[in-house]
Amino acid sequence: MNEKYAALKSNVRMLGHLLGNTIRDAHGEEIFEKVETIRKLSKSAQAGNQADRESLIEEIKHLPDEQLTPVTRAFNQFLNLTNIAEQYHTISRHCEEHICEPDAINSLFSKLVQNDVSKLDTAQAVRDLNIELVLTAHPTEITRRTMINKLVKINECLSKLELSDLSSKERKKTERRLEQLIAQSWHSDVIRQQRPTPLDEAKWGFAVVENSLWEAVPDFLREMNDRLKSYLGEGLPIDARPVHFSSWMGGDRDGNPFVTHSVTREVLLLSRWKAADLYLNDINELISELSMTVSNDQVRELAGEDQHEPYRAILKQLRALLNETKDILDAKIHGQKLAVKAPLQKVEQLWDPLYACYQSLHECGMGVIADGSLLDTLRRVKAFGVHLVRLDIRQESTRHADVLSELTRYLGIGDYEQWSEQDKIAFLTNELASKRPLLPRDWEPSEPVKEVLDTCKIIALQPREAFGAYVISMARTASDVLAVHLLLQEAGCPYRMDVCPLFETLDDLNNAESVIKQLMSIDLYRGFIQNHQMVMIGYSDSAKDAGVMSAGWAQYHAMESLVKVAEDEGVELTLFHGRGGTVGRGGAPAHAALLSQPPKSLKGGLRVTEQGEMIRFKLGLPDVAVNSFNLYASAILEANLLPPPEPKQEWRDLMEVLSEVSCEAYRGVVRGEPDFVPYFRQATPELELGKLPLGSRPAKRNPNGGVESLRAIPWIFSWSQNRLVLPAWLGAGEAIQYSVDKGHQALLEEMCREWPFFSTRLGMLEMVYTKCNMEISRYYDQRLVEPQLQPLGDRLREQLQRDIKSVLNVENNENLMQSDPWGQESIRLRNIYVEPLNMLQAELLYRTRQTEEASANLEEALMVTIAGIAAGMRNTG
């Protein structure tokens, strides 16, 4: 085992050694020795040495306040560096085959050959390939932009050091650079001092595009093209756009009062400015490259007859267009009222002249030049357009109903919110069909209502290409969808936007089918949507509401019934997945998660949210992003060309039982245990999390309520901090054991072998169990929970132990994650640093809760532990 990851371990050692030097220089020998003692005790405790575990606890209990911050920061940085080394390892030349999946696409092709899938079908599936990743801000992306840029540079150094023919002079220079970067990170703020604004979040998203995706997209398409050529004999069409991006940053106003219509307008301007800026870099590079003099007639005509270097002449025209666009957008961003529009409005303004150059170079025998940087730029133009990313708008359904309520009361026709669903639909369809405006000129709406209407006006003023979808959270009825169409129409929106209901609680998921059926029965609505409907499936709220097993089945069921409705109605359906990084929020390794969906659910392509810290792990470096695109592409092609089996009726029946039993078990604790909420508040840093300057949105929808008013993210985040990770497993193992006791062992084993949906669920549970740590959870209880609440923690841990046995028994496995040695190793590697952070966090919570006003020192150290554990647990919220 040890030899297996030798290259990775030697990088971890080297980075750790350099960090040690930095700590010694910054804080002296005493702190360095303290950190080393704790690290060694932790390593020995991990190996099962109980005496050293006790010593570790004592060591941390006796740390003076002023040493807590540097010690905590040391372990936080160790973890960040371990994560970098691990992320780098997956793309390094020393990477073991079973980790890198060197080639998801090629292994898919050999599967297709084995299953006699025709090349014609494959070519069609490739043409239909549509992956839309929706970048969302995330309070758990604790890593600041400054740090992320340093991480990218550290990666570059690791890559250099791997070259075997590096001279000793170059090696020294690179090692010195690494040491500087690690020192820079150490002396920067790990944690933001202020909450980020929605604009900061949007800029963070643009930085991901600039640092990674801008390179990754053409690289991915180039690789894909070569593979298709060798397998199918034809490559990707030049205008193919299998991967593109949308964003919620600056558009998601659900529960976030800071995202206003003016913020949305500014983000749209910034997004276009950034796109123009990135294209300008490309064009400048092409100007230096394309100095050729021979061209076809079309290029000569575009360049003007007397041009000696026609390609450069065309590119210089584009450069002027982009510079002018940037200047005008810049002035608008800085508040100048300009009547002129930025000249770059449509993708064709870039595509047509560049494509003309491309064709001319090919015609004149210079194809090898055309297929270089010019082709990359053309591919970017298709993927990123003039807006860089399309913006989604998200708002809660009740906010739209409030607008209509206030309006109908003003018009004297009653109170919209009190009407029956039938009356609402009649009113909305009537108004949608009507030519006269509905909003009276002299009406002065209240502030919240005006804000919703102003947002609709911003949408109406922008081109269709600027937006992805209008997502309605907590959508429950057909009128919720029609209401948004009406408000957009009233704002003068000249096109029909994709209005996408988000079904997120257990009941809403179960009703999704009937809502969409009802919409499809309205002729007017059918006319609007031009045979295309998008529906979003919420993962986090359903899991918080009913537990993971029950939520997982409800999501599967909802997808399956929506696919059927769409087929019956002859409508194209796009399912939009609101997954998070954690299992409690639907996270699973991408490839497995997609293959475990119902048959035909990926026909309309994939649209999925990528969140905060997962953006960094999956898309943060160009090579890593290319790997992620390959995994997504191969999974979608496989799901569409080799669909998973339809579940047998007896599997479904048993899933119904599992779902019911697990939901009861979960709610029995979360809602039924009178001590549960006080225990949760004492055993986790939930209350302290609210103070963290993490995301731009508040942690609670309603500041006074219990668990149900907590947002899904802090709910899950808090439990992953104390290592009980309760929401990701509670109820599931009990339901499995219940079914075994009822004599269904053989059927469960069959489901495990033959049904990807079920085996993925169990695989996700195994990963969660591996990340749970009962001893640490018990230590939090001893240090933080009052004695009369401690028995509840003991009961939960006993349940967890029983659940692990039940799941391993059904899978016929001896140990957790035995089929995923790399996953195991990766968790083990980080645990050495996570455990001390957990101990430190429990100590810090204990100390801050002892005083009315905790010192800034302790608060900062506490925030660093929260950030560090989040980095160590990888999928936090």
Swiss-Prot record:
Magnesium among keywords: yes
Family stated for the protein in its record: Belongs to the PEPCase type 1 family.
Class of enzymatic activity (EC top level): lyase
Keywords on record: Carbon dioxide fixation, Lyase, Magnesium
Active site: H138, K544
Cofactors required: Mg(2+)
Stored PROSITE patterns: PEPCASE_1, PEPCASE_2
UniProt keyword annotation of Magnesium present: yes
Catalyzed reactions: oxaloacetate + phosphate = phosphoenolpyruvate + hydrogencarbonate
InterPro entries: PEP_COase, PEP_COase_bac/pln-type, PEP_COase_Lys_AS, PEPCASE_His_AS, Pyrv/PenolPyrv_kinase-like_dom
Alphabetized GO MF terms: magnesium ion binding; phosphoenolpyruvate carboxylase activity
Cellular component terms per the entry's GO annotation: cytosol
Gene3D superfamilies registered for this protein in UniProt: Phosphoenolpyruvate/pyruvate domain
Name listed for the protein in its UniProt record: Phosphoenolpyruvate carboxylase
Domain of life: Bacteria
Task of the protein: Forms oxaloacetate, a four-carbon dicarboxylic acid source for the tricarboxylic acid cycle.
Entry-linked HAMAP family: PEPcase_type1
E.C. numbers: 4.1.1.31
Source organism (scientific name): Vibrio parahaemolyticus serotype O3:K6 (strain RIMD 2210633)
GO BP terms in the entry: carbon fixation; oxaloacetate metabolic process; tricarboxylic acid cycle
Pfam families: PEPcase
